[in-house]
């Protein structure tokens, strides 16, 4: 029973870490990355469809993304969706390819993005701590029902705390990498 609680906590902490990494991967750095356009939805036959499903996105050079739209009639809609997104990008169409140049980030914008990344990291840490609390509550319920001893309760809580510390270190490491990436000119 205790092993199941620990495994469940580990799986949930891993999901928290993945969610954090997914969030920060969408935050734009000075380099071109297809994940920058992940949040963009394009109106396609009356339905909001993710841009990734409608176009092939490749990195042309360090500051340019190239999109090849599968359905040529959607090119204008894709361009409009990119322009109206809050990313501050201005795509240009050249035949079948839409090029999206990424402007250089200003120092002020970099600092704002670092604040956003730090806030995301704190949210990730809070999520991991909530998983720890849930796991400890389950163990305490077992202790209350006399299904486990106090020694097992203590040992289990120590295991969950070690797991929590390990995942928080992973969040901090991902944060440090992203901050360095943002400040790298």
UniProtKB/Swiss-Prot annotation:
InterPro entries according to UniProt: Ribosome_recyc_fac, Ribosome_recyc_fac_dom, RRF_sf
Coiled-coil ranges per UniProt: none
GO molecular function (one): ribosomal large subunit binding
Signal peptide: none
A GO CC annotation given for this chain: cytoplasm
Compartments where found: Cytoplasm
GO biological process, one term: cytoplasmic translational termination
Pfam family, one: RRF
Keywords on record: Cytoplasm, Protein biosynthesis
UniProt keyword annotation of Cytoplasm present: yes
Family membership: Belongs to the RRF family.
Xref: HAMAP family: RRF (MF_00040)
Function of the protein: Responsible for the release of ribosomes from messenger RNA at the termination of protein biosynthesis. May increase the efficiency of translation by recycling ribosomes from one round of translation to another.
Name of this chain's protein: Ribosome-recycling factor
Gene: frr
